Amino acid sequence: MNSSGGSCSSLMDVVAYDHHLHHGHDEELHVLAVDDNLIDRKLVERLLKISCCKVTTAENALRALEYLGLGDQNQHIDALTCNVMKVSLIITDYCMPGMTGFELLKKVKESSNLREVPVVIMSSENIPTRINKCLASGAQMFMQKPLKLADVEKLKCHLMNCRS
């Protein structure tokens, strides 16, 4: 797990708005980026830093669930509350060993604490049935890998359109 911050001049407006409504103050936005491929994970982290103030990375869905407080049932409730309150967006690869991004999406949407957090699924494969399954299960968006800066802008515009 890795967290890093940076300065932002243009934040994802809708995520910032939702974050402000839920938390009542202007703290850094927090994106959880999940990908088993180190290069893809670093690329996503770099692109998100351009639009977001803070990015936490996880190398697989199980580590992401642990971070979110959904992994180990014995995890202390304070850690769960702390991390849930800070995550504004989850972006995850679809194909990962152990647990897929789709399974992570389902776990997040089943959680009463996390179901409102937007989840974006990424994949290098453009399979319409997979895309439709993810969107029908609550994914905010499905994006083709490798991500580019234009994709981050597309995500921003999509989230803004969903708000209105």
Curated annotation (Swiss-Prot):
Gene3D superfamilies: 3.40.50.2300. One of its GO terms (cellular component) is nucleus. InterPro entries: ARR-like, CheY-like_superfamily, Sig_transdc_resp-reg_receiver. Induction: By cytokinin (BA) in roots. GO terms for biological process: cytokinin-activated signaling pathway; phosphorelay signal transduction system. It is found in: Nucleus. SMART domains: REC. Keywords: Cytokinin signaling pathway, Nucleus, Phosphoprotein, Transcription, Transcription regulation, Two-component regulatory system. It comes from the Eukaryota. The modification 4-aspartylphosphate is found at residue 93. Residues 30-160 form the Response regulatory domain. Two-component system major event consists of a His-to-Asp phosphorelay between a sensor histidine kinase (HK) and a response regulator (RR). In plants, the His-to-Asp phosphorelay involves an additional intermediate named Histidine-containing phosphotransfer protein (HPt). This multistep phosphorelay consists of a His-Asp-His-Asp sequential transfer of a phosphate group between first a His and an Asp of the HK protein, followed by the transfer to a conserved His of the HPt protein and finally the transfer to an Asp in the receiver domain of the RR protein. Belongs to the ARR family. Type-A subfamily. Functions as a response regulator involved in His-to-Asp phosphorelay signal transduction system. Phosphorylation of the Asp residue in the receiver domain activates the ability of the protein to promote the transcription of target genes. Type-A response regulators seem to act as negative regulators of the cytokinin signaling. This is Two-component response regulator ARR16. It comes from Arabidopsis thaliana. The gene is ARR16.
